[in-house]
């Protein structure tokens, strides 16, 4: 049985003296799907509980022998149980993780880094979401290890409210991000005022 637990040791680069080449990510069992779409810039009807955030996020995957998205999805299915950040912004963190992992990774030693830098519009239902002016600096290390394979994740999300015009993210379930949001049980509902946008319920 596979166990999920917080990393005890840091996920770090292998020694540079080792001559072994970096392994590419293993072929995944899942179908590679297109990245999520962003709704074109437009004026939103709904003004309440809406925030623009300048996002700087990333996920570093540490795995000496490569990795598959099946393992990443397995780890993220337990995200609610292991999340250690501000719970008023857990929905935002899930959105950022999904969007970051839908991009192309950059190799760093034996690690693979997915980054996301973007200004996004988030809307929360009712009185949910962050307080006015609240910011987020979240980082966490998570590992998956079944004695035959080790995969470590370093998740980092910086979110600052800003007045730069952002894009509305939307849920395209036929995308890698959509799969990951489903795995993390992202709670949303469609906005009644703006049919193309989603309201976060967490």
Curated annotation (Swiss-Prot):
Its main location: virion. Pfam families: Rhabdo_M2. It is a peripheral membrane protein. GO terms for molecular function: structural constituent of virion. The keyword Membrane applies. Keywords: Apoptosis, Host cytoplasm, Host membrane, Host-virus interaction, Membrane, Viral budding, Viral budding via the host ESCRT complexes, Viral envelope protein, Viral matrix protein, Viral release from host cell, Virion. Residues 115-151 are annotated as: Essential for glycoprotein binding. GO terms for cellular component: host cell cytoplasm; host cell endomembrane system; membrane; viral envelope; virion membrane. Homomultimer. Interacts with nucleoprotein and with the cytoplasmic domain of glycoprotein. Interacts with host ATP6V1A; this interaction plays an important role in virion uncoating after viral entry. Late-budding domains (L domains) are short sequence motifs essential for viral particle budding. They recruit proteins of the host ESCRT machinery (Endosomal Sorting Complex Required for Transport) or ESCRT-associated proteins. Matrix protein contains one L domain: a PPXY motif which potentially interacts with the WW domain 3 of NEDD4 E3 ubiquitin ligase (Potential). Belongs to the lyssavirus matrix protein family. This is Matrix protein. It comes from Rabies virus (strain Pasteur vaccins / PV).
């Amino acid at each position: 049985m596979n166990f999920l637990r917080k990393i005890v040791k840091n996920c770090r680069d292998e020694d540079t003296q080792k001559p072994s080449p970096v392994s590419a990510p293993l072929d995944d069992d899942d179908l590679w799907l297109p990245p999520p779409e962003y709704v074109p810039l437009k004026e939103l009807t709904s003004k309440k509980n809406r925030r623009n955030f300048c996002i700087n996020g990333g996920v570093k995957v540490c795995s000496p022998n490569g990795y598959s998205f099946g393992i990443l999805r397995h780890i993220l299915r337990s995200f609610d149980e292991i999340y250690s950040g501000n719970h008023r912004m857990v929905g935002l963190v899930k959105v950022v993780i999904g969007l970051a992992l839908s991009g192309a990774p950059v190799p760093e030693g034996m690690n693979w880094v997915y980054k996301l830098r973007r200004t996004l519009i988030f809307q929360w239902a009712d009185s949910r979401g962050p307080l006015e002016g609240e910011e987020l600096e979240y980082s966490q290390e998570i590992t998956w290890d079944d004695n035959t394979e080790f995969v470590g994740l370093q998740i980092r999300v910086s979110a600052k409210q800003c007045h730069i015009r952002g894009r509305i993210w939307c849920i395209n379930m036929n995308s890698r991000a959509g799969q990951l949001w489903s795995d993390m049980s992202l709670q949303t509902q469609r906005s009644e005022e703006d049919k193309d946008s989603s309201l976060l319920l967490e």
